[in-house]
Amino acid sequence: AVHVIHSGESGIFIPKVEHNMWVQKGTLIGEIVTPITGTVEEEITAPSDGLIFSLREYPIVYEGSVIARILSMS
């Protein structure tokens, strides 16, 4: 199955993983921060074990933006 991860907040996306990386459920994928203060608005975690095969490169995100896609083997 493919899990598409969306942003729940608007701001700047700072990735904490790399493309083509294996992650476990709960792994921190990245953070959404406010551009002026740098306050973390959202921590985005992996919903399942799997392979990150798509990871956002453009840092500006809006609520609902696609952040990553994970290929899960379960």
Regions found by a protein language model. Name each.
Residues 1-31, 35-67:
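Generic structural motif
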Residues 68-74:
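C-terminal regulatory/interaction regions
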